[in-house]
Regions:
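N-terminal secretory signal peptides that target proteins for export/translocation
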Residues: 1-14
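Short beta-strand element of the alpha/beta-hydrolase
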Residues: 420, 427-437
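Beta-propeller blade-edge and WD-like acidic-aromatic loop motif
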Residues: 46-62, 85, 89-109, 128, ...
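Conserved beta-propeller blade repeats
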Residues: 71-89, 114-132, 143, 160-179, ...
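Active-site-proximal cap/loop segments of hydrolase catalytic domains
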Residues: 464-654
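N-terminal cap/lid segment of alpha/beta-hydrolase-fold proteins
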Residues: 386-425
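Short amphipathic alpha-helix adjacent to the substrate-entry channel of hydrolases
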Residues: 445-464
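Bacterial N-terminal signal peptides
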Residues: 17-33
C-alpha cells in the first residue's frame, strides 16, 4: 500500500483486541466494585439529597452516574525508538498507573503506586522508565526507576516537599535530566542524575520556570525552555559539558515556542510557534544559529497544538486544532509524503513518533472514551491498540455536540459546543453551562462521562470558549488579560441569554459549573448575573485573587500575575474577586475542593463558603482530605458526581 493511505487492522486483530477489551472492562469494574467505602476513604462530609431515580427517567433504562464514572480510558502513550514497544497509562485500578502493551496485546501493569503515577518517560530502547508519583494530590512528585526487563521499581530521587518533573533520558540511557525546585520553592533548576551511581549534578540555574525539552543524539546538547508566563517562553541550547548557553528564540512581546525538537545534525530545530503575522501557532523549521524560520504548514488557518519529530529526524507528526477538533497529520520528511487522518472526527493528542515511522496517539470523541492508536507512516496502517470499557452502557445512547457561535456584547463571536438530549422537543429544558479552566484552556468535543449522563436525564449543555481561550490565535487568548477579566464573564452571560432567547432554556433554570479558573468564572457569573442562573458548582476555583496569589505555590505566582494582574494592584484584584460580592449571589452553590491543592489552596473554598453563609445564601461544600487540584481517585469521583447530579436535579428540575 502506498504511503499516505490509511488501512485499518484486520478482523482477526480486532477479535483478539476484543478479548483484551473484555478483560480490561472486567478489571475496571472489579476495581471500582471492590473499592473501600468511598465516604470513609475520601474524608468528605456528604449529606444525601433527593435521589435521581425518584424524579428522573426509569432507572432501569438509564444507568447510574456511578456506572458512567466507571467507563474506562487510556492516555499518555509512548513508543520505543524502534517502534516495537508501546507504553500508556490508565486508571483501571482507580488511579493512573503505567502499563506496557505486550506483543500479545496484553496490558502489563508496571507501577502500583497508592496514589498513582503523575508522569513518566520511557528510554530509547524501552528497557527503562522513569516515573513521577506524589501523594494526596500534592503534586510533589518523587522520581522512581522502572526496569522493564526485571519489573523492579526502585526510588531514584526522593525529596520531601519538592516537585520533580519533565524527565528526559540521555541517549545512552544512563542519565535522566529533570527540573526540581528543591533549592528554592519558586525556582526550577535543571539537574542530571546518574541512574547507576545516584550522583546528581545541577546543570542549569536560572530563576523561574525552566525545563529540559529535548536532547541531542550524541547526548552533548540540551534544549531548555524558560517560561515567563503561560503565553511567553524562550528556548536555549545548552552545551552540557561547558555550560555554554545559546539563545535560540530572542524576541520582544509574548510569543510561544513549544514542542521543540533537535535535528540529528543540530542544524535546525522543529517547533510550534505563534511568532508570525496572524498569531496562529504553526510548525516552523528554525536554523541554528542563524535563526532563519521556515513555516511548514503556513497556509493552514488552524492552530497547531502538538508536534513530534522522530529521533532520526525522518518523520514528523502534528495535530491541528480545527475549531476544537484535533486532526492528526504525519509526514515522511525524506520523500515528502503526507497523511491527514481527518476522517477520525474527534480529538487526536499526546503524539509520540518513533524512528520506525510509527505514531502512537490518544484519540477520543464526544461519544468514545480515550484510547491508544498507532499509525504507520510508511504503510498507511491505522490500528486501535486499547479498547476501554463502556461499563456495560450502550454507546449508541451517547450524543455528539453541535458547534455553534453566539455574539457577545461587543460583537465578538464566541464558539461553543451545544449538547441537546436525543429527541429534544423544542421546548425549554434544564441546562448546564460548563466553563473550562486555564484560563488559557479550551473546551473540546472530548468524551465526558457526566455530560452523557446528564443528557440521558433530560439536560442540555452549553460549553463556550469565552475570550481568553486557546485554539484561536494569539489575539483571542489575550482578550481577557488583567483589567479585561470581566469581559470574559460577560461572554458567559451572553451565552446563557442566547439559550433563553432561542428557546433552549428558561431564565433561572440554567446551572453553571467549572473547575479551577472555570470555578472562578462560575462564581463571578453568579455574582454579576444572579437572576439568569439557578445553581452553581465551583470546583477548585479562585474566590479571592489576593489570597490566591499570596498562597498559591511560589513557583506559580509570577506565572499567574502575568495573567490576572500584580499582587501590588490589590484594589483591582479584590474588586474582581467573587468573595468581595458574595451578597449578590442568589443561586444555591456547591463548592468542591481538595485539602492538598497546591495551585488553588483550599482556603479559597472555605472563605467563599463562609462569605455566602454569612449573607444568608445556600451553600454546600465537599472537601476531599486526600485530593489536590481536582478529584483524581475513582472513589472520590463517585462521591463528587453523585453529589453533583443530586444538586442539579434539586435546583433545576423543580
Amino acid at each position: 500500500m502506498s504511503k499516505g493511505m490509511i488501512r485499518l487492522t484486520s478482523r482477526v486483530a480486532w477479535a483478539r483486541a476484543a478479548i483484551v477489551a473484555g478483560l480490561l472492562g472486567f478489571l475496571a469494574i472489579t476495581a471500582a466494585t471492590h473499592a473501600p467505602s468511598v465516604l470513609a476513604q475520601s474524608g468528605a462530609t456528604d449529606s444525601p439529597g433527593d435521589s435521581l431515580a425518584a424524579r428522573g427517567p426509569d432507572p432501569l433504562a438509564v444507568p447510574s452516574i456511578e456506572t458512567f464514572m466507571q467507563i474506562g480510558g487510556a492516555g499518555s502513550p509512548q513508543v520505543s525508538e524502534d517502534g516495537s514497544t508501546v507504553f500508556f497509562t490508565t486508571s483501571m485500578t482507580g488511579v493512573d498507573q503505567v502499563y506496557e502493551l505486550l506483543r500479545s496485546g496484553w496490558p502489563y501493569q508496571l507501577t502500583a503506586f497508592v496514589d498513582g503515577s503523575d508522569f513518566y518517560r520511557v528510554s530509547y530502547t524501552g528497557s527503562k522508565v522513569v516515573v513521577g508519583s506524589s501523594t494526596g494530590g500534592s503534586e510533589q512528585s518523587n522520581l522512581y526507576f522502572v526496569d522493564t526487563d526485571t519489573d523492579l521499581v526502585s526510588p531514584l530521587r526522593i525529596r520531601d516537599k519538592v516537585q520533580h518533573g519533565s524527565p528526559l533520558w540521555s541517549p545512552d540511557e544512563r542519565y535522566v535530566y529533570f527540573r526540581s525546585n528543591e533549592e528554592t520553592a519558586k525556582d526550577f533548576y535543571i539537574y542530571r542524575i546518574d541512574t547507576v551511581t545516584g550522583a546528581v549534578e545541577k546543570i542549569w540555574e536560572h530563576a523561574g520556570w525552566n525545563e529540559p525539552i529535548a536532547i541531542s543524539r550524541d547526548g552533548n546538547k540540551l534544549l531548555v525552555s524558560h517560561d515567563e508566563s503561560n503565553v511567553n517562553n524562550y528556548l536555549y541550547l545548552l552545551d552540557i559539558a561547558t555550560g555554554q548557553e545559546t539563545p535560540l528564540t530572542p524576541h520582544d512581546g509574548d510569543y510561544l515556542f513549544q514542542y521543540a525538537r533537535l535535528t540529528p545534525d543540530l542544524s535546525h530545530i522543529y517547533l510550534v510557534t505563534n511568532l508570525n503575522d496572524d498569531g496562529i501557532s504553526r510548525i516552523a523549521r528554525k536554523a541554528v544559529p542563524s535563526g532563519e524560520i521556515e513555516f511548514l504548514n503556513g497556509e493552514s488557518p488552524w492552530e497547531t497544538e502538538e508536534m513530534d519529530l522522530s529521533d532520526d529526524g525522518e518523520y514528523l507528526a502534528w495535530v491541528e486544532n480545527v475549531e476544537g477538533y484535533g486532526e492528526l497529520h504525519a509526514r515522511d520528511l525524506v520523500d515528502g509524503i503526507e497523511a491527514e487522518l481527518s476522517e477520525m472526527r474527534g480529538i487526536a493528542s499526546a503524539i509520540d513518533v518513533s524512528s520506525a515511522g510509527t505514531v502512537v496517539f490518544v484519540f477520543e470523541s464526544a461519544t468514545s472514551p480515550s484510547d491508544i492508536w498507532k499509525y504507520d507512516i510508511e504503510e498507511g496502517d491505522l490500528a486501535k491498540l486499547t479498547h476501554s470499557t463502556f461499563a456495560g452502557i450502550d454507546q449508541s445512547l451517547f450524543t455528539e455536540p453541535e458547534l455553534i457561535h453566539y455574539t457577545s456584547f461587543d460583537g465578538l463571536g464566541i464558539p461553543a459546543f451545544l449538547y441537546l438530549p436525543d429527541g429534544w422537543a423544542g421546548q425549554p429544558i434544564p441546562f448546564v453551562m460548563d466553563i473550562h479552566g486555564g484560563p488559557e484552556g479550551q473546551a473540546r468535543p472530548a468524551f465526558s462521562r457526566h455530560f452523557q449522563y446528564l443528557l440521558l436525564n433530560g439536560y442540555g449543555i452549553l460549553v463556550p470558549n469565552i475570550r481568553g481561550s486557546s485554539g484561536y490565535g494569539r489575539a483571542y487568548i489575550a482578550l481577557d488579560n488583567y483589567r479585561n477579566r470581566k469581559n470574559s464573564i460577560r461572554d458567559i452571560y451572553e451565552g446563557a441569554k442566547w439559550l433563553v432567547d432561542n428557546g433552549y432554556a428558561r431564565s433561572g433554570k440554567i446551572g453553571i459549573k467549572g473547575g479551577s479558573y472555570g470555578g472562578y468564572a462560575t462564581l463571578a457569573a453568579l455574582v454579576d448575573y444572579p437572576d439568569i442562573f439557578g445553581a452553581g458548582i465551583d470546583d477548585v476555583g479562585i474566590a479571592n485573587f489576593v489570597t490566591f496569589l499570596q498562597n498559591t505555590a511560589p513557583y506559580r505566582r509570577a506565572l499567574r500575575e502575568a495573567e490576572y494582574g500584580p499582587l501590588a494592584d490589590s484594589t483591582f484584584l479584590l474588586e474582581i474577586s467573587p468573595v468581595t460580592h458574595a451578597d449578590r449571589i442568589k443561586a444555591p452553590l456547591l463548592i468542591v475542593h481538595g485539602e492538598n491543592d497546591p495551585r488553588v489552596p483550599v482556603g479559597e473554598a472555605r472563605q467563599m463558603a463562609a462569605a455566602v453563609r454569612a449573607r444568608g445564601g445556600v451553600v454546600d461544600t465537599l472537601i476531599f482530605a486526600d485530593e489536590g487540584h481536582g478529584a483524581g481517585k475513582l472513589s472520590n469521583r463517585l462521591v463528587y458526581y453523585r453529589k453533583m447530579v443530586e444538586f442539579l436535579d434539586r435546583h433545576l428540575k423543580n
